[in-house]
A protein has these predicted regions:
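Alpha-helical scaffold domains
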Residues: 1-182
Length: 182
């Protein structure tokens, strides 16, 4: 019987759960990943629950930047100790697509103890995808930090960046509503 390391076992799970129709659709629509198994997010969340926190495996998966599912699973396995602003910024600098950016913010960045610093660093980036992540992050806090959300959204709307335009407009609208209510 063959023994597999953790990374190989996870990849075998991806393969067993693959969805060729979804994978082909993603490829045709410009997904930047060379390898796409076509798993949906609930399937990836189930795998993460089975594995539990595992920083070493999370780093291996994140380094596997040619595989979509590896990039989606990695943030789910990270322990709180790994969620430093410096480490998360290093990871953010390697993100190139919205799906991974959304998942990264939801599964890792929001759990960081240094959200304010990350908001400042991501929001001040020259890379549109990092500013997109900052908007996603501030949007999750718009009720409690509407002034900052409004400032960030207005600044991003001034840039007129296609990637962030609609999200910035949503953040602005919600921040204005909360500002009126308070």
């Amino acid at each position: 019987m063959t023994d597999f390391n953790k990374l190989q076992s996870v990849k075998r799970q991806f393969f067993a759960m693959r969805n060729g129709v979804l994978a082909d659709y993603m490829r045709r629509n410009g997904s930047p990943y060379r390898i796409i198994f076509g798993l949906n997010l609930p399937q990836i969340v189930d795998i993460a629950r089975q594995l539990g926190e595992d920083d070493e495996l999370a780093e291996q998966l994140w380094a596997n930047d040619t595989t979509r599912e590896s990039r989606l699973l990695a943030p789910m396995l990270m322990s709180a100790a790994q969620l430093t602003s410096d480490h998360l910024m290093e990871m953010a600098e390697t993100i190139s697509d919205v799906e991974v950016a959304d998942n990264f913010v939801h599964r890792a960045v929001r759990r960081s103890g240094d959200v304010d610093r990350l908001l400042t660093r991501l929001g001040g980036s020259e890379r549109a995808i990092e500013r997109y992540m900052a908007l996603r992050l501030v949007y999750s806090r718009v009720e409690s930090d509407f002034a900052r959300a409004l400032t960030m959204a207005e600044a991003e709307l001034q840039r007129d960046e296609p990637l962030t335009r609609s999200l910035a407009a949503m953040v602005k609208a919600d921040a204005e509503w909360y500002a009126e209510e308070n």
